[in-house]
Amino acid sequence: MAGAGIVGVSTAIWLQRFGYQVKLIDRSGPASGTSYGNAGILASGSIIPVTTPGLISKSPGMLMNPNKPLFLKYAYLPRLMPFLFKYLRYANIEHVENYATAMSQLLYDTVDQHKALARGTGAERYIENNDYLFGYDTEEAFEKDRFAWDLRRKHQHDFDILKGDALHNVDPIYDGSFKVIVVNRNHGKINDPGEYIKKLAEHFVDNKGEIIQANIKGFQQKDAAIIGLETDRGVHRADHVIFTLGPWSGDLSKRLGLNIPFESERGYHIELINPSRMPRNPIMVSSGKFVVTPMDGRIRLAGVVEFGGLKAKASKAPIELLKKNAKKLFADIKYDNITEWLGHRPTTANSLPLIGRVNKFKNVLVGFGHQHVGLTGGAKTGRIIAELLDEREPNIQLSWFDPNGYV
């Protein structure tokens, strides 16, 4: 296996449970990338893509406004343009409805899937059942999102829309901050994503799994099979090979014969360490498109979309925006210090992850491209990949996620 984020670790544990001997190879070790720095939400209702109608007309204004959560490293634009044209093609109602149908299958039982994955590993303690809130500054802002909430309702998501006096019962920490709060039921969170995945990986090793920290250089092929992964620490042979490399999947996917428009969508977080008060539940602040999550000993604010590739250094502007938003939302909270982080979301042009077998090779499977819902969908994706390898029939329509049939 290549890649030790949530998808890779989940796949490895489920394969181990099915009786396979597994090697997990990652250049930095478990949970060293996006799986560490995400917002920690198990968001079964995250079935609306970024590419919604109106995105094309709104984007230029957002890029020119440093208070909006969209950023671009302009030197990267020539390389980005081919992907961007394909990506923006999907900013239409038909695709949003198709995306919601596909992702509802993958995400609806995310909390149960994580609990099943963590059972008996010692990682159970990191999983919490929580409501997930969406906060709107104005009723007009909420009404602009009405289509998304109607679509969630259509897919049987349970939520309450609160206004007026009802807002006082949600969380005192947000009193006066919002005119509308939507309370999503049947959600959850991981209170420390990095430690959660490391604990899962520790269980994997304790049960005779092997984790190898190495850079993957290529692979060895014989006929229609990959028989070994070439790394800077030697060649590792295998009967089956699975790639779950997240944002580092783009170049590799081409070598696997896949035609996937693919980019890294850069995201940021800051953390308020040892805050004097804690929110009860995580909340998406709609105006700034960032998520506030109470975690072990800190409040994490995660969000922002920046296109700039995998190699560029972190930008100051997204971090400063998150700090500004934190100061506005939590003006009365004291904390010891602030930490900062940059990560990469693996993004396909149609925003759907790729899950399944690769036609070019008889023994290769992939699982990547979850964009904003990698943690939410990662446990189930790993289970699906393990079931496919073991020739079981997953209880999901996988045609939406076919890596060979990208349209």
Ranges and model annotations:
Residues 162-171, 189, 210-227:
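A conserved short coil-to-beta-strand element within the FAD-binding core of flavoproteins
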Residues 81-202:
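Rossmann-like flavin
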Residues 1-24:
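N-terminal Rossmann-like FAD-binding beta1-loop-alpha1 element of flavoenzymes
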Residues 18, 40-41, 46-90, 218-226, ...:
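Active-site substrate-recognition segment that forms the wall
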Residues 159, 287, 328-407:
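C-terminal catalytic lobe of FAD-dependent flavoproteins
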Residues 17-37:
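Glycine-rich FAD pyrophosphate-binding loop
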